[in-house]
Amino acid sequence: MIIEDRIKAFEKLGDFLMDFCNENPNSNHLLETIIKSSSSYNGWFTSSNIRSSISAICNNLRSAKLSSWLSSYSIPIEAKKNVSIIMAGNIPLVGFNDFLCVLMSGHRAIIKLSSKDNRLFIPIIEELIKIEPRFKDDVKLVEKVENFDAVIATGSNESFKHFEYYFKNYPTLLRKSRTSVAILTGEESLDESCLLYTSPSPRD
């Protein structure tokens, strides 16, 4: 699949997600149902929190943005690699960018979802494959990480130590816990100050 076809597919996925965020009556009802029940399996995942994450994702899935981003890289045409993605679950769909990067680079995404966020991705992956069926063989959800060529893993500091040990013989991109601060100017509205304060993310 050429890069232009991948860009078109993800742009259409962005349109699908935008319709959902705009509450289009023709949008995916399964995704709506999952969001409404999300707090029962992860109390941090409120409906507004999830919709905010989805909105941020679909805003970046524009053809111009994707083309500009990819133009900075030389993507070689070579045999596909199986890239295992071990996703975190601190923010809704936090592993989407890793998923996007793997598929855009022409490789296969072997995904192990976090137990804290193991529902939202499914209807999104199904929609992407519906848009572009050639992705069907390039996306696989797994419970056990095996049969891979490289690893992208995100987790706690303790998980990071395990990742380093278990994947020491493979190409890896490993992430552990981070902390950050926000700088306020004093001109923020109350709504802006409160926005996205919740969830166990690096900004808290």
Regions found by a protein language model. Give the residues of each.
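Rossmann-like NAD(P) dinucleotide-binding subdomain of oxidoreductase/dehydrogenase enzymes
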Residues: 66-195
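Active-site catalytic microenvironments for nucleophilic, acid-base chemistry
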Residues: 16, 127, 131, 201
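Conserved small/polar residues in nucleotide/adenosyl-binding loops
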Residues: 197-204
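Residue-level marker of positions within ordered structural domains that often coincide
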Residues: 11, 189, 203
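Sparse, context-dependent recognition of short Cys/His-centered cofactor- or disulfide-binding micro-motifs
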Residues: 35, 42, 46, 92, ...
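Generic recognition of cysteine residues
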Residues: 21, 58, 101, 194-197
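N-terminal Rossmann-like NAD(P)+-binding subdomain of aldehyde/semialdehyde dehydrogenases
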Residues: 1-84
